[in-house]
């Protein structure tokens, strides 16, 4: 199938903000595709060429793409950069530049979806001394045959910035609609496999029954079950009846997979960080059985046995070089709290059974590997739960988790069966969409940041400017990132791609017509830069409203 047909779909999606229309457009297109193309489009429709959990990436920067565009249309990279600055986007710049194209490609064949998909995957395979030239050649081969509209979306895909307003939820609904399958079945398959290309093919070839057969596979990460804010401890314990109450650690949530003697470690965003944690791999090799499993836990950084801040473990996980040195500087501890797979899938088993099996298989002899500190919460043991909370705070942890002991593990769900009870003010994870440069001595820094939440259609809605909680080093870092993600600048105002996630604390939510959500935050303070999160992980307008109604 011609790539132009997919490009026409991209354009139609970009030109509507209505979720139902987007779903219908994608659904109609999916029905036209053979299985091979369907698997490719299941990824390309989200601007991806690999499943979310894959550690492969295109790895191409703006300058390389601009160089290739320049060669394709016969202008210098500086001219391309000027066009990007004028248009605010590489895709729109291509539309402008291709209209003035001075070079003509003779006997070129129309681009196909298959050719584009395979060419993009080749980009991830190129490394070494001559890799830059080889990558440019691959991009140039596509761009030289591309129309202006094809170049628009091709360059955006290479830079992983498709910008057509489509998220996983819309694609899920489109698959369900196209192949007449219940949305909940597609949703479960998505949470278990995190591969919409695979799901689309199974839906087409095997229908609802085939999707129901998809299950956990060690080596392929599953979206984590999520927690929401807990009401007072007695209220929630009385409601649950029996709860497992655990210390809430200030670290990075991990899924550790063992499959065929290989151990892989994934973050909550499905990022493979095995390379950064060799000592954790060694611990699991030595102190857990040599069976296939998926365990979940939290890894924290320590010093003299005491927990360090979240930023310390984040720096450690992000380290790509000198890992041995990092291991000495930032010792780690792992606290395990759930077992999703042991020889067979266990997520449909109640938490109590999963916890007991976890206790059976983990050898906690070394200090570096532990089970989460836990008490059973019942109406008769509320004092013990409150004592665990006080102990957790005294040990410099965040608070406690309260989980319904009778519940299965539901990937991707944020609900009342898993709750967090924290001492700190409640926070929201929000993405930066713009900012304002300071004045005077801070004129070179972006000093105030415009932050947004997701609505039900995955559109970003502004909620506040935040300007406190940032020291000079953090301002310098954020300003550098803002320039890297800049879309446009006017006076002191800057608009950026939604890439930077901030954890923001506040004293109160108030109604405000000034922002797109209809609400704002009183006394917002940046608590953390959440480098472990992306725009898909930020909080929602729905949660903001829920917090407003219950504050």
Swiss-Prot record:
Its EC number is 6.5.1.1. InterPro entries: ATP-dep_DNA_ligase, DNA_ligae_ATP-dep_bac/arc, DNA_ligase_ATP-dep, DNA_ligase_ATP-dep_C, DNA_ligase_ATP-dep_cent, DNA_ligase_ATP-dep_CS, DNA_ligase_ATP-dep_N, DNA_ligase_N_sf. ATP binds at residues 246, 253, 268, 298, 337, 414, 420. One of its GO terms (biological process) is lagging strand elongation. It catalyses: ATP + (deoxyribonucleotide)n-3'-hydroxyl + 5'-phospho-(deoxyribonucleotide)m = (deoxyribonucleotide)n+m + AMP + diphosphate. It is an enzyme of class 6 (ligase). The keyword Cell cycle applies. Its cofactor is Mg(2+). Pfam families: DNA_ligase_A_C (PF04679), DNA_ligase_A_M (PF01068), DNA_ligase_A_N (PF04675). GO terms for molecular function: ATP binding; DNA binding; DNA ligase (ATP) activity; metal ion binding. The keyword Lipid biosynthesis does not apply. Keywords: ATP-binding, Cell cycle, Cell division, DNA damage, DNA recombination, DNA repair, DNA replication, Ligase, Magnesium, Metal-binding, Nucleotide-binding. PROSITE patterns: DNA_LIGASE_A2, DNA_LIGASE_A3. The active site is at 248 (n6-amp-lysine intermediate). Belongs to the ATP-dependent DNA ligase family. DNA ligase that seals nicks in double-stranded DNA during DNA replication, DNA recombination and DNA repair. This is DNA ligase. It comes from Methanobrevibacter smithii (strain ATCC 35061 / DSM 861 / OCM 144 / PS). The lineage of its organism: Archaea, Methanobacteriati, Methanobacteriota, Methanomada group, Methanobacteria.
